[in-house]
């Protein structure tokens, strides 16, 4: 299979490329990435001689068309993803997430190429903390941030192109990921690298917000399963049934790093901070036989901490800029 991976130099995309090559799942991989602050050549350095990396904008219709024409399938990760950045400036999110997805859809329509579109559980809004319900494939969309609204718009474009033009596409909505190569602006790597650089970890508000955590390799194994075995036009929800509130995750990280679990600062909460995300992955499990492998959250966190300890040269150049932005916001 000749595979085009958009956003393949970002966190989840780069890990997907590593997984596909590690398990010999494809004959060739082309990565299209704008290499903005969140994309890094270094994330692909271990496999650089086995892929083709093209730097370019996902909205460049001519470039995208040429790359899609050479491919048997496209996995579309490319997106702006950080909620705090979307609150400060939503325009790049509209550009990449909405116009970028439209550009991909037009290219795969023209060349009749299989597409898998990667999305987020944030399109469903949030759940009350005391509500046992979980998101499933029939949950109505109710996005609450500039980020999630652009991802919801992208999902709906994919659905419309499937129905109107017969595009061969699937969608997945996944819960919060963790693992290697995640940018230090994100919650888990921020706390790990704060400890490693002698800074105090920072927790938004009281830390009661609940997230459903999944290791990035489990997410990507599900994406591959959907790409190869999923039903065209379907949406699949990906989760590992690992709900933790942010306070618990913070204390677990500190404990695993040999620190006092209460040695952190409470900082200003995010505006409109969603309360709880929770995914019911039963359709994916029952229909496609997928199951996560990284089911021990503490073991997964330990591996992630070890990766950041061993790869300071990857994240250290990013750290000061990220923390300066957080400091400006009182976070």
Curated annotation (Swiss-Prot):
Q: Which domain of life does the protein's organism represent?
A: Bacteria
Instruction: Please give the start and end residues of each transmembrane region.
Output: none
Residues at the active site: 121 (proton donor), 122 (proton acceptor), 147 (proton acceptor)
Q: Which residues form the signal peptide?
A: none
**An example molecular function term from Gene Ontology annotations:** dTDP-glucose 4,6-dehydratase activity
Checking SUPFAM superfamilies in the record gives:
NAD(P)-binding Rossmann-fold domains
Q: Which reaction does it catalyse?
A: dTDP-alpha-D-glucose = dTDP-4-dehydro-6-deoxy-alpha-D-glucose + H2O
Residues that, per the record, bind substrate: 81, 120, 176, 186-191, 202-204, 211, 246, 269-273
Residues that coordinate or bind NAD(+): 11-12, 33-36, 57-58, 77-81, 96, 147-151, 177
* Enzyme Commission code(s) on record: 4.2.1.46
As for what it does, the entry says: Catalyzes the dehydration of dTDP-D-glucose to form dTDP-6-deoxy-D-xylo-4-hexulose via a three-step process involving oxidation, dehydration and reduction. Involved in the biosynthesis of the dTDP-L-rhamnose which is a component of the critical linker, D-N-acetylglucosamine-L-rhamnose disaccharide, which connects the galactan region of arabinogalactan to peptidoglycan via a phosphodiester linkage.
Q: Which family does it belong to?
A: Belongs to the NAD(P)-dependent epimerase/dehydratase family. dTDP-glucose dehydratase subfamily.
Query: NCBIfam families, per this entry?
Result: dTDP_gluc_dehyt
Q: How does it assemble?
A: Homodimer.
Q: What is this protein called?
A: dTDP-glucose 4,6-dehydratase
């Amino acid at each position: 299979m000749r595979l085009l991976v958009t956003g393949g130099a970002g966190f989840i995309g780069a890990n997907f490329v590593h997984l596909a090559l590690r398990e010999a799942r494809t004959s060739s991989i082309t990565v299209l990435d704008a290499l903005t602050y969140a994309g890094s050549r270094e994330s692909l350095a271990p496999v650089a001689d086995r892929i083709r990396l093209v730097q370019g904008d996902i909205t460049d219709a001519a470039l995208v068309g040429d790359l899609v024409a050479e491919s048997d399938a496209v996995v579309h990760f490319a997106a702006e993803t950080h909620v705090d950045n979307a609150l400060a400036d939503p325009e790049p999110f509209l550009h990449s997430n909405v116009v970028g997805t439209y550009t991909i859809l037009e290219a795969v329509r023209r060349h009749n190429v299989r597409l898998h579109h990667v999305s987020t559980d944030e399109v469903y809004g949030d759940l009350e903390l005391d509500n046992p319900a979980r998101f499933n494939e029939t949950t109505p969309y109710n996005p609450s941030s500039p980020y999630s609204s652009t991802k919801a718009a992208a999902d709906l474009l994919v659905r419309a192109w499937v129905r109107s033009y017969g595009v061969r596409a699937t969608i997945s909505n996944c819960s919060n990921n963790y693992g290697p190569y995640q940018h230090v602006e994100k919650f888990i790597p921020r706390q790990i690298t704060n400890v490693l650089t002698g800074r105090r970890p920072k927790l938004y508000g009281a830390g009661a917000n609940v997230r459903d955590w999944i290791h990035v390799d489990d997410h990507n194994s599900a994406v591959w399963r959907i790409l190869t075995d999923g039903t065209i036009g379907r949406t699949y929800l990906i989760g590992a049934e690992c709900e933790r509130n942010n306070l618990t995750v913070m204390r677990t990280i500190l404990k695993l790093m040999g620190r006092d679990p209460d040695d952190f600062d409470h900082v200003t909460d995010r505006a409109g901070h969603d309360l709880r995300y929770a995914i019911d992955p039963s359709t994916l499990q029952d229909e496609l036989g997928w199951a996560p492998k990284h089911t021990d959250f503490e073991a997964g966190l330990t591996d992630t901490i070890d990766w950041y300890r061993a790869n300071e040269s990857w994240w250290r150049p990013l750290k000061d800029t990220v923390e300066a932005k957080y400091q400006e916001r009182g976070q």
